[in-house]
Amino acid sequence: MNITFIGSGYVGLVSGIIMGYLGHNVTCLDNDDVKISKLNKKILPIYEAKLDEYLKHALESDRLKFTNIYSNEFRNFDAIFITVGTPSKELGEADLKYVYDAVDKVSKHINKDCLIVIKSTVPPGSCNNIIAYLKAKGFSFNVASNPEFLREGSAVEDFLYPDRIVVGVNNKESEALLRKIYAPLIEQGAKFLVTNLVTSELIKYVSNSFLATKIAFINEMADLCEKIGANIKDLSQGVGLDQRIGRNFLNAGPGFGGSCFPKDILALNNLVENHKIDCKILKSVIKSNKLRPSNMVAKIATLLDGDLKGRNIAILGLTYKAGTDDVRASPAIEIITILLNKDVYVKAFDPIGLENAKKNLEHKNLLYFASAVEACKSVDIIVIATEWSEFKELNWQEIYNLVKSPMIIDLRNILDNEVMKKIGFRYYAVGSQI
């Protein structure tokens, strides 16, 4: 089928490339000329495991192209997927200006049978509002909701082998078209859930907010473990082995970040407040996660006898999680910002997200390094802020010989306590007593 993705950011790019790989004729549009030029040269603007292989395959199969121009070629498309950003406004409400801008532009170029699919994360009721908006302008296009559930770092696998495909429609024609588009995945067993527009939109918000709640809860249980001497890793495993709960998102750490969880839980909280519902759980999760970076800094300060000013601290890991170059709302960046405000000298390293971190945060007391070993030279403490597997493989004996003070605080619980102590480090992890 002939389909287009408007917005070649993370969601649009991954979705478009894989749809091309699955056999559809795909056009990805973005208003960033530099990005489009690079993509046409097979240069990805994001890091995502295996995505470069699928990009090459789709381009060489002549099923994928990139453009920055809305044209009459759009009249040949069966569906237009809107995958632009929906950033948060000041009070947490989703800003839909990019969605409406995309809808405005495509409506002038597509045929009357083309389906407009909203894949951007939008508040419940948005698709119905878009239908009314188009009708007021004299258009009667079908509009569907199709939220994405891709995890950065494993997005290719998530798209090819999804837990479920959710679509919100208001007629059989839209459902039939989406079934055709997703046929390669449905045929291999993917669950295809059809619901109404509002429910489909709400599923995305509730899914992300529930996962954020699991993270916030286990983080607070880690604090309890520190007080009473319980083992947070064993606790997470013991709880997660219950099939009613599940093991995923029960890893204690410095809080959740990224482009989705913080934004989506704020938007859901804004939605319930607009409907006069006092959802105390959402408020508590938002507050808990907001305080988490400060709590991590407090732990670091405790290990340094309460004296942070003038200290040299290595931060290993800058992205909000491993497997991505995304530093948006990264707990590591938040922690660094707090430390810099306390006159700390920070030496930072990340295996993938270094360049994005440099664009995001600059300071006279902040130095970025091309290797973890270099970042750790002559520091008072090493902070593991992101769960990169590379950190497990570092030559920690070499690092031990380079540091000023052999102390590690592992905010992701990825290193082996006994191994670190055998080398000579004072090792502390989230959920262990300080």
From Swiss-Prot:
Family annotation (InterPro entries): 6-PGluconate_DH-like_C_sf, NAD(P)-bd_dom_sf, UDP-Glc/GDP-Man, UDP-Glc/GDP-Man_DH_C, UDP-Glc/GDP-Man_DH_C_sf, UDP-Glc/GDP-Man_DH_dimer, UDP-Glc/GDP-Man_DH_N, UDPglc_DH_bac
Gene3D superfamilies referenced in this protein's UniProt entry, alphabetically: Cytochrome c1, transmembrane anchor, C-terminal (1.20.5.100), NAD(P)-binding Rossmann-like Domain (3.40.50.720)
Keywords, comma-separated and alphabetical: NAD, Oxidoreductase
Catalyses which reaction(s): UDP-alpha-D-glucose + 2 NAD(+) + H2O = UDP-alpha-D-glucuronate + 2 NADH + 3 H(+)
Catalytic residues as annotated in Swiss-Prot or TrEMBL: 260 (nucleophile)
A molecular function (GO) term: NAD binding
Binding site for NAD(+): 2-19, 30, 35, 121, 152, 263, 328
Pathway: Nucleotide-sugar biosynthesis; UDP-alpha-D-glucuronate biosynthesis; UDP-alpha-D-glucuronate from UDP-alpha-D-glucose: step 1/1
The keyword Calcium is annotated on this UniProt entry: no
Taxonomy, superkingdom: Bacteria
Annotated binding of substrate, by residue: 148-152, 204, 208, 249-253, 257, 321
GO BP terms, alphabetized: polysaccharide biosynthetic process; UDP-glucuronate biosynthetic process
EC number, as in UniProt: 1.1.1.22
UniProt similarity note: Belongs to the UDP-glucose/GDP-mannose dehydrogenase family.
Identification of the protein by name: UDP-glucose 6-dehydrogenase
Species this chain originates from: Rickettsia prowazekii (strain Madrid E)
